[in-house]
Amino acid sequence: MAVISLMFLAVMYVVHHPLMVSDRMDLDTLARSRQLEKRMSEEMRQLEMEFEERSRAAEQKQKVENFWRGDTSSDQLVLGKKDMGWPFQAGGQDGGPLGWILGNLWNAGLFCLFLIFELLRQSMQHEPAFESSSEEEEEEIRVVPVSSYTRLSDFPSQEALEAFYKHYIQNAIRDLPCTCEFVESFVDDLIEACRVLSRREAHPQLEDCLGFGAAFEKWGTLHETQNFDVLVPIVPPQGTMFILEMRDPALGRRCGCVKVDSECMCKHEKLLGDVLCLVHHRDHSAMLSKCTSSIKAALCTSSHLDVCKTVQWFRNMVSNAWALVAHKYDFKLTFPPSTTSCKLRLGYRSGRSLSISLVLGVQREDTLVYLVSQAPEQEQLTSVDWPESFAACEHLFLKLVGRFAPENTCHLKCLQIVLSLQDHQILPPGASRPILTSYHFKTALMHLLLRLPLTDWQHSMLSLRLQDLLWFLGRGLQQRSLHHFLIGNTYLPLTIPIPKAFRNAEPVNLFQHLVLNPVAHSQAVEEFHNLLAQVKTLPCSPVAGGL
């Protein structure tokens, strides 16, 4: 009987606690396991209550029967039946005190064994991480609740926010999806013409473009969608390879250098036996070294890709490619000066114009992280430093949210309303530019998308979610802390391809400069308070009472 009990316990443990696929349990599985444990505990409690009720009923019935039979030892018989339930008692004989003690020891041992297994399982959950094992599970990737807080008073109602959005935002970006589609199609046409021109040249090859930023991610306002940013990845030609040499992030700059070298397996692996290295063999090295030398002479500074030289080479190629495709389009194309990107300006006869920035990028490993040619305005880098960009990763995340979220969600509307008000904000005296940027608000929104279920972003919850967004950023300003969305974020879905080291890295504080500069922090706080005042008094819309 003891062996059967032990086997049953082992089987039940395997059924309810299956082996995990890795040493870290994802957040969805953790939530479901806790719900299952809670449900099992409630069911066990209910069964215990039912068992006790039945035992008391049987005891009472036995007492009544014994009383009518005239049995004066009814209480002892009933108690004896209760003691006979332990595995160490055989037949109808009473095991006595020793049997009762052994029975309790056996059950206590089983309980301790089960408790040890449970503690071991819990110890494997100390580092939760998002791991979507299927497309069905990706839809349920937000389970961490946002801390409760006091709702803002005099906040606009749902109707007021909708009226503001339709009047100031929706009409202004009505044609944005069609414009984005045209921009990508036009850039693809230019890239294809560039490939034709560079077919016989030993220069970097161009891959398919990727639109990113406010316009392509559908959260931009009229101001944010005046410029269209397009990423154009480049890869080395045959016989040449790019070696990425990353700078130390502790220095405060996330960038790297792109070293150009001859491609050869002997630089990656130790060749066995007398295997011939075709690159370094004297019969082939001359041709391949000529290819590498050509790139170094034209585009490099000390064997590293020079941003300015590479952009100028790309700009000249696009200019030549335009001559091949100009007959297809009815606008005038000009090239505004720039040293970090190839800027295009499309001028139509109607007076309308479009501005496009073609940003070159070198892919980091097999991820969506790129070293790009265009640096943020506040960073001063050398000509061989290529800043690290996570734009493609963030674009994919928002695309996944749009795919699995319910129809007509309000997450993009929240960001658009805030940015639209910020565009019309007057800077504090003495300030040359705002401290709070659209990227800060976008980062706060993406954090909230991970912390709240997608069902909480329905159309009817616009007012609540907008308050959540403002509260999240306001708390970050108060604490001088806003973590980067991708670096050190253990809740990030594994479907977002980033370097493995980024998931286990220390979070990067986007407000670190506010810690070091109290004046900048004061300006950021003032900008935030002005934004709150703007939200509470939306133009051309009534204000409702506090929520």
UniProtKB/Swiss-Prot annotation:
Signal peptide range in chain numbering: 1-22
Membrane topology (UniProt): Single-pass type I membrane protein
This protein's UniProt keywords: Cell membrane, Coiled coil, Membrane, Signal, Transmembrane, Transmembrane helix
Classification via Gene3D superfamilies: 1.10.1410.40
UniProt keyword Hydrolase present: no
GO CC entries: plasma membrane
Transmembrane regions: 97-117
A matching Pfam family: Mab-21_C
Extracellular side: 23-96
GO biological process terms, semicolon-separated: calcium ion import; negative regulation of T cell receptor signaling pathway; T cell activation; T cell differentiation
Main location: membrane
Topological domain spans for side Cytoplasmic: 118-547
GO molecular function, one term: receptor ligand activity
Location of the protein in the cell: Cell membrane
SMART domains recorded: Mab-21
Coiled coil, from the record: 28-66
Family: Belongs to the ITPRIP family.
Function: Functions as a ligand of CD3E, inhibiting TCR-CD3 complex signaling to regulate T cell activation. Induces stable CD3E-NCK1 binding, thereby preventing the CD3E-ZAP70 interaction and subsequently inhibiting the activation of the downstream ERK-NFkB signaling cascade and calcium influx.
PANTHER family: CELL FATE DETERMINING PROTEIN MAB21-RELATED (PTHR10656), INOSITOL 1,4,5-TRISPHOSPHATE RECEPTOR-INTERACTING PROTEIN-LIKE 1 (PTHR10656:SF40)
Record protein name field: Inositol 1,4,5-trisphosphate receptor-interacting protein-like 1
Organism: Mus musculus
Lineage: Eukaryota, Metazoa, Chordata, Craniata, Vertebrata
